[in-house]
Amino acid sequence: MSAQITHLPANASREDQLHFMEEDGAVIIDDVLGNKQLQALDQDLTPFLQQKVFGRDAFTGFYTQRVGALIARSKACGELALRPRILDAARTYLAEHCDDVQLHFTSAVAIAPGESAQILHRDRGIWGGYVPRQIEPLFSTIWALTPFTRENGATQVVVGSHRWEKKRQADPDEIAYAEM
């Protein structure tokens, strides 16, 4: 059996959410967004995704669209970033090594049929070796606006790998898919 990411209900306690973040490095909170929010996000993002601009390399995906600067482009995306529950979780998770949080990056991603799986990577790699491994510099969120499955490109997550040594590589059965 392959690895799994724990799913919690939308009303799960902050403590439960943080427990799985700290232990596993990931948790999925189910049914957080209602239909009205999903419709607003779809309405805001559709004009940008209709432009059909795809990645230019294997990492970003030749059949993957990415739209950045979402706070400037979408009121609904801005509301997601400012959700008190998310900010509270991020502040608590990162508190040991920071005074507050800063939004670093926003991106809408649409994966078209025929895309290959992105290579496994650690997001913290954007800092090279400048941030000691004992310091966690990131708290990332992924919001599934449409079904997010292994078959259509759900993000691969290696549960617990945030505690591994840098050179340790995942075995295939250690890879979970952020299906939601």
What is each PLM-predicted segment?
Residues 2-24, 30-131:
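Non-heme Fe(II)-dependent double-stranded beta-helix
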Residues 148-180:
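Double-stranded beta-helix
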